[in-house]
A protein has these predicted regions:
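Hydrophobic alpha-helical and helix-loop surface patches within well-folded domains
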Residues: 3, 146, 248, 277-537
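N-terminal, polar/Ser/Thr-rich
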Residues: 54, 58, 62-99, 185-188, ...
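Extended, low-hydrophobicity, Ser/Thr/Pro/Gly-biased non-transmembrane segments
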Residues: 105, 164-270, 293, 435, ...
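Aromatic/His-enriched, Gly/Pro-containing loop or helix-boundary segments
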Residues: 114, 136-157, 193, 197-200, ...
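A surface-exposed beta-strand-loop module
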Residues: 121-184, 241-242, 566-577
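Non-catalytic accessory/interaction domains
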Residues: 218-221, 244, 287, 370, ...
């Protein structure tokens, strides 16, 4: 804590000169400044200016405090941005720790002497700073919780500076976060799992999705081991003591959470090439498990071209490895060039496999490959917009695997997912977009709501504005933000520009509210009378209502008040029975609302319209009937 002109810092600190990590209280030699082992504590009340002069005379790395010294609470200050990373790591899966040197090129917005970045549980050995093209000079540093503060010995910025950090990190074998190791039989393996904020456990970095930069990775490993990473192998050179140096091609800009590497006695199989650029595809498994990956081999060549065709952009990365990972905490992770899958999901003996399991694997692979555009090529600017990654990948995976199904089953998966999501959403758990202000809140980043309600939002808007115009808008969105970041507002703006439909009120409601509307329909005098009841209360929803009317094309109307009347020509028959034409009020089956028809309308659509509905519309009718009549089932 801070007391007067002196600072008591019960944290790890160092000067950057030699192995100087220190635990325990350290007194600084400047007012609220960083400490140096060579600095001496002064009596309380001594003049700060005199101390700075003394430190300067003695050539000590002691600097006056600035507002840049204030520790971040969660989000990094915006004054520094990484433009390139170089990682040089020595990794032996048999050891519980590894050594690393991280060199980071940084662009500074303004003059400063302090740089903040992320670290967690790293043992910092040395830190040095260099102006571009100059020699490195030792810097003082301090670790505070999940941050590393570096104080330069000279003024830096605005402009570029290089930061080099020499450190050690743990390879945890008790959990599966950060860089960790697992044993299978007699073999040890190292894997990484960084999403959303655990890259900082493996190397110092700007561990936020808005900070994307190229990564050059070099691994020093035992000669009998294999190393893989995001980029293709660039070179492999034998070193002393039974080691070898494996360098990988520098990546395109990536967020830290999708940087990945793995080391161990892997089996690797060439799975051919895929996509417009005929990128190489490989399957990677623990030793002796390749036969259990049979179902995965053909999937990439079949699914990747479908995603390229929709996005209009060739697969953006230089290779595509699918690797089975021991005890991966997620089902799969979309690291560019090195997609990881939980081994129990990815590897199944052909003798025990089932068509259902294969279909689920293909959908998982389609989801992770969709992330190569939605999440990696274009990355959410902050975690409150994680749905731009997960919602899009869920929606895309359903789209590209739909043709794997028999015709009478196509489109049903999204309706089933919508129904399940609405049952959960009725409980008011959380909205799709949730502001992230603490580490604890990031535990909720990958909630099911983000995936399924995010995907349902996209499907509803797609059917409302039209599949063709929506596709044009999505392609434009990807082109505008390629290799960068995006926000929900930017997506909404692009959709509106390319479709001419004002989608923002609809999407904002879907993404920022919990619940959904229950909408009641009845016919009177060739008008469809519509009343909505927000489930969970609140103001009326703004939602498109798409109707399928007998002998007419499907059409959509915007419901933006509690009650509307929609003219429906031909809705009433003038024949002797005076029957209403049948109407189903959730055409396409994608509207995120419960449709409740009055008795006469329901009888008509069940008796005369059911056979004319699409499979998705039939299912949406049935699930809405069940949800309203059996709400607890």
């Amino acid at each position: 804590m801070f007391k007067g002109d002196s600072v008591i810092i019960p944290r790890k600190t160092g000067t950057g000169a030699g192995d100087s990590s220190i635990e325990g209280p350290i007194l600084t030699c400047a007012n609220k400044g960083l400490r140096s082992e060579r600095c001496r504590p002064r009596a309380r009340g001594c003049l700060t200016s005199l101390m700075i002069v003394l430190c300067g005379i003695l050539s000590l790395p002691c600097l006056a405090s600035t507002t840049d010294d204030a520790a971040p609470s969660f989000r990094l200050p915006d004054g520094a941005r990484p433009t390139r990373y170089s990682l040089d790591l020595t990794v032996d899966p048999r050891s519980p720790a590894f050594h690393g040197v991280a060199t980071i090129e940084i662009e500074l917005k303004r003059a400063t002497r302090v740089i903040w970045l992320n670290q967690k549980s790293l043992t910092i050995r040395r830190v040095a700073v260099s102006k571009m093209g100059g020699s490195y000079r030792p810097a003082v540093w301090e670790t505070r919780e999940e941050f590393l503060m570096v104080r330069s010995p000279f003024a830096i910025g605005p402009g570029k500076v290089d930061l080099r950090v020499d450190y050690d990190a743990m390879l945890n074998d008790k959990s599966s976060v950060g860089a960790y190791r697992k044993k299978s039989g007699n073999d040890w393996y190292v894997y990484t799992s960084f999403t959303p904020i655990d890259a900082r456990r493996a190397f110092p970095c700007f561990d936020e999705p808005g900070y994307k930069a190229p990564w050059a990775v070099t691994l020093h490993i035992k000669r009998e081991d294999v190393a893989v990473a995001n980029g293709p192998d660039a070179s492999s050179t034998d070193e002393a003591d039974g080691m070898k140096r494996v360098a990988f091609k520098e990546t395109q800009p990536l967020a830290s959470e999708v940087v990945a590497f793995a080391v161990g006695p892997f089996d690797i199989e060439d799975a051919g090439v895929a996509g417009e650029k005929r990128i190489p595809v490989r399957i990677i498994t623990p030793r002796g498990r390749m036969a259990d990956a049979a179902a995965a081999r053909a999937a990439t060549a079949e699914l990747l071209p479908r995603e390229e065709a929709y996005t209009g952009i060739a697969y953006p990365w230089d290779k595509l490895d699918h690797i089975a990972v021991l005890d991966l905490p997620f089902g799969a992770t979309e690291n560019p060039g090195l997609i990881t899958y939980r081994d129990s999901d990815f590897l199944v003996s052909p003798a025990k496999d089932t068509p259902r399991r294969v279909a689920m694997l293909r959908k998982t692979m389609a989801h992770e490959m969709a992330h190569q555009w939605f999440g990696n090529l274009v990355t959410q600017a902050w975690w409150d917009d994680t749905w731009l990654s997960e919602g899009f990948a869920t929606w895309m995976a359903a789209k590209v695997t739909n043709t794997d199904l028999p015709e009478n089953a196509q489109g049903l998966a999204m309706v089933q997912a919508r129904d399940q999501m609405m049952r959960l959403d009725a409980k008011g758990k959380r909205p799709v977009r949730l502001e992230m202000r603490t580490r604890e809140q990031t535990d909720d980043v990958y909630d099911l709501v983000v995936y399924q309600k995010g995907a349902a939002t996209l499907k509803m808007v797609e059917d409302w504005v039209g599949e063709g115009p929506f596709r044009v808008a999505i392609r434009r969105y990807l082109q505008e933000h390629a290799m960068g970041n995006a926000t929900t507002a930017e997506l909404e703006r692009t959709i509106e520009e390319k479709t001419g439909v004002k989608v923002t009120p609809v999407m904002d409601g879907m993404l920022n509210r919990v619940g959904y509307p229950l909408i009641r329909f009845r016919l009177a005098d060739a008008k469809l009378l519509v009343d909505q009841e927000p489930v969970g209360g609140g103001t009326p929803w703004v939602v498109p209502i798409c109707i399928h009317l007998e002998n007419a094309k499907r059409r959509c109307e915007l419901l933006d008040t509690a009650r509307v009347e929609i003219p429906v020509e031909g809705a009433q028959d003038d024949g002797p029975r005076h029957r209403h034409a049948w109407i189903w009020t959730n055409a396409y089956g994608s509207g995120y609302y419960r449709a409740v028809l009055d008795e006469e309308m329901l009888d008509e659509v069940l008796d005369r319209g059911y056979s004319e509905l699409s499979e998705a519309e039939r299912l949406s009718l049935l699930v809405d009937i069940k949800a309203v009549t059996q709400p607890d089932h």
